[in-house]
Each structure stands twice: as structure tokens, then as C-alpha cells.
Amino acid sequence: MAKRNPSIDTKNLTAVQLMELDACVRCGECVKWCPTYAASGEKPGLAPRDKILRWRQYMNKSYGLKARLFGPQEIPISELEEFKDDVHGCTTCGICSTVCEAGINTVELWESMRANLVKKGIGPYGKQNMFPKLIGQYRNPYMKDQKDRLAWVPPDVKIEDKADIVYFTGCTAGYNQLALAFATSRVLNKLGIKFAMLGEDEWCCGSALIRTGQAHINNVPYELAKHNVEAIQKKGAKKVLFACAGCFRAAKVDWPRLLGKELPFEVVHVSEFLAGLIKEGKIKWEKSINKTVTYHDPCHLGRHVGVFDAPRYVLSHIPGVKFVEMDRIKEFQRCCGAGGGVKAGLPDLAMAVAESRVKDALDTKADILSSCCPFCKRNLMDGRDSLKVDLVVEDVIELVAEALNLETK
């Protein structure tokens, strides 16, 4: 009788991750904090602990002592398909890793599980499977023409051909959420900051592919990172500014990992850059906002990279802003619901998480819910509209632009 092959393999799982599967002590702390588990009505399969225990069970069935003695046990494809749905029902926000008593790096574990299944033809989820083809062909996920990368730039914005600073716009801000690009570019001009942009040479950062377990398909993320780094170098940049938290995380964490070396320039989020200018007394405000503002930490900016204080510092120094905090902030913040491909693959789940976060903001009595991420802004606006409540959702850079008496349209 032919020996059965294991239903799963160890591809994409490092030795550390294999040990992490055994490190879970089933305490359930992650279950209490998981935003998608809560928003789903506590569907058991979405709990972080459940995903680890199930994958550990799969590994034992495939490679444990009994498997070595008597051959691997078959795992029905229907069961793996169900697991695929659950592992993709995660925004990769990282709160489970933050509260994990065993210190398991769950974000990278989920991404490895996703990649493992995708390589076996199981997953990704829904529209997520279009990402490699779209981004590989169009260099952006929206099927937009690369020639239109700078179509949004208004006549009043001055861009240098080469400069020490490059503003990396990002696909979402450059094609869909133009207010973010308008605000960032005009603020930089107003402050006398000379900057260049990549234009047609700006390609997608690759974040969506990596988060959904598709980094290996045609090696697209590597090609994106390599091209963007070379394009930035050609501009003579020493510093690259990002207003998109997802792009920032990709450049800060993923690009060096993909390329196997440190980047030849500094990667800075615009909130960090502005906080530095405020401390140096280089921003002269022209208008008072006179609103109560709260702040939502984007997962990619906060938990993933550790930028928590800069956006708060900026907001607290805008004239007329009364800054208030929500109940869950910084390392323990509640995700907006858009990350990890959930907005594209499971929009109803993304909406449910967003509604929970909007309710957090409403509890503060704030007039404005701010963030530093176009995906957070979009999903929080959707959550607000679903709840039919009166709450302005704006990016921090938009509030800065307003206080400098600049247009964001």
C-alpha cells in the first residue's frame, strides 16, 4: 500500500514558528481582544487560539509520532477550506501578539499559514486572489494607468525633479483618496520642504500581497520593492515620506526583508516628520480648528512599527484642538477592520469591526475621529455611515492642512 503524503507541509513556516505552535498554552487572552472574533458574534473558528490549536493538530496528524509510525492522517479538503476561511478572517492587526503570554508573533504566523495554503491551491479568500495579477500587470490594485500616477497633482503644487526627500504617495491616495495626497503635498510646499515624487516609476508597495499570503506568486512583491528602491535612489533621496500606514509598514519592514539588506534611505511617516518640525518651531499655524478630536492608531503604523506618539503630538499642537483618547489605544487599540485583506475579502466583517471602533470614538464625545491611514479612514467612514451617526473622519495630515489654511480638494 502506497504511503499517503501529508495533507499539509511545513513550507513557509520557520523553525521558530513551528515551536510557537507548541508554545500556545491555551490561556485564551487573545480571544478576549480579537476584533474580528468579537464582531463575528464570537465565531469559534476566528479566535486566534483556535487557529493555532487547529494548525498544531494538522501538523501532528501530518508529522507527529503516529504519522511517523503509521503514516500521515488525511485531513479532508473541506476542513482545510474551512480553516482557510477562518485564517483569512483576520485583519492581521497584531493585538493577539501584543497580549500573548507566550510572546507568539501571530501576524507573521497567520501570513505563513495563508501562504502555505495558497501554495496548495487553497485560498486566498474572495477577491484577494486577483491581487497578484492586477498588481503584477498594472503596478497597482485598481487597474489604473501608470501614466496617471501624477494626474491628481494640482497646478499650485511644486514638485522637484530630484530632492533629498521623496514623497511616496501610494496607490490609494494617488488614485482614490486624493484628499490625503492634496493635503500632504500642499503642507510640504507651505513649510518650504522641497520634495520629489516618483510619478510613473512609483509601483505598488506590495503590502496587500504579503498580508494575504501571496508574496511568492511570480515574486511580485520582490520586484515591486526592488523597483521602488531603485527609483527612489535615482531621485537622490535621503529620506522617503509616507502618509499611508500600509505603504510605510511595507517599506519599513517588508522591503528590507524581501531584498535581504537595509534600505539606502530613511523611511519616515509624515506624522513623525511633522512632529519633528513642530518641536523645532518651524510650523506657524494660521487657523484654529476649535474641535474635539480623538485618534485611531492604524495597526500598520502603531503595533507593527511602533509609531504611537508622533500623531498625538501633532494633534495636541494644532490650535483649537481638544485632544481626547478612546478607551483602547496604542498597543491595545481596536483595529478599524480593513487590514489583512478583510476589506476586500470579507466586507461585512470589516464593516462590523469598523462600527465597533466608531462606537469607541462616539463614547469620547469627539467631533472628529482622526487617523493616519487611508484604509482606516475609508473603513471608519463606512462604519460611521452604517451607524448613521454625526462624526467627521479625517486624516491627521488633513487637519494639519486645515490649520495651515490650505485646501484638501
Curated annotation (Swiss-Prot):
Enzymatic reactions: methanophenazine + coenzyme B + coenzyme M = dihydromethanophenazine + coenzyme M-coenzyme B heterodisulfide
Gene Ontology terms describing biological process: methanogenesis
EC category name: oxidoreductase
GO molecular function per UniProt: 4 iron, 4 sulfur cluster binding; CoB--CoM heterodisulfide reductase activity; metal ion binding
Chain positions recorded as [4Fe-4S] cluster 2 binding sites: 34, 90, 93, 96
SUPFAM superfamilies recorded: alpha-helical ferredoxin (SSF46548)
Enzyme Commission number(s) from the entry: 1.8.98.1
Pfam families: CCG, Fer4_8
Entry's cofactor comment: Binds 2 [4Fe-4S] cluster.
UniProt entry keywords in alphabetical sequence: 4Fe-4S, Iron, Iron-sulfur, Metal-binding, Methanogenesis, Oxidoreductase, Repeat
Cofactor: [4Fe-4S] cluster
Residue stretches making up the 4Fe-4S ferredoxin-type domain: 14-44, 81-110
Residues at which [4Fe-4S] cluster 1 binds: 24, 27, 30, 100
Self-association and partners: The dihydromethanophenazine:CoB--CoM heterodisulfide reductase is composed of two subunits; HdrD and HdrE.
Record function comment: Part of a complex that catalyzes the reversible reduction of CoM-S-S-CoB to the thiol-coenzymes H-S-CoM (coenzyme M) and H-S-CoB (coenzyme B). Electrons probably transfer from phenazine to the high potential 4Fe cluster in HdrD subunit, then to the low potential heme in HdrE subunit and finally to CoM-S-S-CoB.
Family: Belongs to the HdrD family.
Protein name, entry field: Dihydromethanophenazine:CoB--CoM heterodisulfide reductase subunit D
Organism (species): Methanosarcina thermophila (strain ATCC 43570 / DSM 1825 / OCM 12 / VKM B-1830 / TM-1)
